[in-house]
Amino acid sequence: KTTMSILECILVEAKEGTIKFTANDMELGIETVIEGNILEKGTIALDARIFLDIVRKLPDNDVTIETDDSFKTIITCEKAKFTIIAKSGEDFSYLPSIEKNDCVVISQYTLKEVVRQTIFSIADNDTNKIMTGELFDINGSELKVVSLDGHRISIRKIDLKNEYTPKKVIVPGKTLNEISKILPG
C-alpha cells in the first residue's frame, strides 16, 4: 500500500486527438496512448482500482469521460453512467523520457520466454537489492540474461539479429513480472 495517494491513480491526459494513460508507483511505470475525440484538452488523475473496475464492466463501445473544474468525473458508455471524484494531475510523478536510439529488438515471445525461464531464481527479499532483478548483458549480437538468488543461478543466451554496443542493465523482477503479464502468448 502506497503512502502517496496520487500513486494509486491513473493519469489521463487528453490533447490533440489522443488520450494518454499513465500509471506509476515510483518503481514501475506504464504508459499507453490511444486515439480519441477531444472536445477540450485536460489532465486528471483517476483512482486506478475504481477506474479499472468501471472500465472492465463496460460494453465494448465508445467511452466518454467528462470532468469539471471540481474534478467530478462522469464516465459513460451506452446506458452505463458512473460518477467519481478525480484529482488534479499536478502531483502525479511523470515517467522519465527514454531515448529510443539505444534499443535492442527482440520478439515479444522471446522476451516472455526468457523471463519465464529465468525469473524463478531472483531473490525475493531486499537484503541484496541487486539480486531482486535480472542482468541483461548485451554484447554484439548476443543477449545474456542472468538471475541469481544466492542458491540458484539462471543464464539464458539469445542470438540477436543485429549488432549492438555492449551494455549491461539490471531490470527489477517486479517490472519483468508485470511485462510478462502484458505480453501475448
Which sequence ranges carry the predicted segments?
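Structural preference for solvent-exposed beta-strand-turn elements
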Residues: 1-185
